Amino acid sequence: VGSEMCIRDRYCTFQLKEIQDINILFQLTSAFYSEADKYRSTVEKIIETVHYHTFAVELAAKLLENGISTPGQLLAKLQEERASLDNEDKIKIIKDGQSSKATYYSHIHTLFSLYALSRKQQDIMCNLCFLPYTGISARIFTKWLELPTLNEINDLIETGFVQTTTRHTISLHPMIKEIALSETKPSVSSCHILLDSLQKICLMHGMEVAYYKKLFQTIGNIIELIEKDDIPKYLLFLENAFPYMDNYNYHKGMKLSLIHI
């Protein structure tokens, strides 16, 4: 394993891993992209262009497997983006050759933008920004968004943007969350279905939900991240969430709500 770099935000720390062995990363690509052998030299250039970052390599492989771009097209796009980055700010490259967070973010952003997600998928990504990093049940989230099936979620899992576990818990990779927040700009009006669903749960005072902690963590993220473009609706949401948090003695969320009411 090469070098690692930690990025901190107010929620967590995660590592940007670089594996300098091109063969290991080529094997990783092959696991997701069935034609990797056929385009080996181009695939290896893609791996080099994204600075050997494992998550970027995985996303690139999944993008190629989905047929959204040919290896040659993807390489050209990444090289074009890398050249513009080099011109913009050479100071951001750390002495030992590691790429900075800005460069890494840019690679992931380029891969994200190449997908041209449908309006529905963008809407789902927008709402996924509020989930706790530990994730939540895919079925519960689907119910919150009033989605008829899990199909759209499953499609996003295939892209690599949405992470999942064997227990069908879904979450966003922290870097993808950052990009989704800047691209989709979640607001009270654009996320009204999610807010209405959570509000309905909070109004059922006599009913308990097993996932209450994750519910409150989601509400906490909404408070901190959402664009408050409909103040009356937002305040009503907080006023209805507060007593439900009180039922569970969830003081952290209550304090956060009080600051914003």
Where on the chain are the PLM-derived regions?
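Short, compositionally biased segments
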Residues: 9, 256-259
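AAA+ P-loop ATPase catalytic core
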Residues: 43-68
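Loop-to-helix "switch" segment enriched in basic
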Residues: 25, 63-121
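Helix-loop-helix "sensor" segment of P-loop NTPases
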Residues: 10-50
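Short, small-residue-biased leader/transition segments that mark boundaries at the very start
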Residues: 1-7, 261
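C-terminal boundary/linker of central alpha/beta nucleotide-binding cores
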Residues: 57-65, 109-184, 191-196
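Active-site donor-binding loop signature of nucleotide-sugar glycosyltransferases
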Residues: 16-19, 62, 80, 174
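Extended alpha-helical scaffolding segments used for macromolecular assembly and cargo binding
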Residues: 190-257
